[in-house]
Structures are given as C-alpha cells and as structure tokens.
Amino acid sequence: MKRIYFISVVALALGLGAVRVTAERRAQEAKPDAKNEHAYSGMYTFLKEGEFVQVTVEDTGHVTGFVSRFGDGESDKGAFLDQFFKSGKLDGNQLSFTTDIVHGVSFDFKGTVERGDGKNPGDEAYFLLKGRLTESASDVNKKVSAHSQEVVFKMFPQDGAPAAVERK
C-alpha cells in the first residue's frame, strides 16, 4: 500500500512539474525576444492591399526602412511612392519611426512589436506592429492636416517577401 501511495505521489509531482514547464514555455513564446531584435526586421502590411512597410533593426536599436504606398494626390494618384525613414528607434519592443515627406505627406508610427498568430518564425503574422499611425499632409498653401489611427501591420511570410532594399 505504501508503495502505491509513493508511486502516486511521484507521478503527481512529475505531472505538475511538466505542466509548469509547459506554461513557462508558452509565456516565453508569447513575448517577442528582446535579445534578438533583428528578428523583427522584415516586411509588414501597410494601409492598403499592395502597400507595405520594410523595417530593418540595426545593432544599436536604430531602425531603418521605408514605406511603399500608392499616391493619393492629383499628381501622383495610383503611382507607387517610397518614403524612407527619417528616424527610427526600437527600445525593447517599443517601435517608433517617422518617414521623409514625399509629395507633401509623411507618416509617424509609435507602437509595439508583438507576437502574432504565426506559429513559426517566417510564418505570416509571426510578428505584428501595433500602435498609432499619424499621416500628416500639407497642401499647396502649406496648410498641414494630420489624421491619426490605431493600426495593426502583419509581418509578411519570409518566403513571400522580396529582398530588402538598402538605403543609400
């Protein structure tokens, strides 16, 4: 009888230990790995179908990249425009960037990098950019208007993304 009791106690202890290890592993997977910030580098969706933002994380937390989008103005309607980052920073999972002004429009993003629904690195939506995007536009009279919205940009799958373009 003591032997059965002992075996039951050992089995219960091992089972609880396995549950704890599994819970800890899931908690770690849910958080982006701040030690491997380069993993955040990649191409993410942007506001419209066919538009994207390329994010490249450097060693120091400095972020470079660009937004590729369709023009909305009368002179650039439907044209594909690239807006390089004027500044960009990653601190832990806090991401911010501001683009150059192109045809009177610039973008400012402040938010976080978070784990998405992708199961493995390289899967679609493995990482997400969540935050507030502010679009500033100036007209011919230099009057500036700003529109701000909450956004979620999903990382493209690694095999489906074209190679990154280096900024010169």
Positions of PLM-derived features:
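Central antiparallel beta-sheet cores of small beta-barrel/beta-sandwich binding domains
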Residues: R26-K168
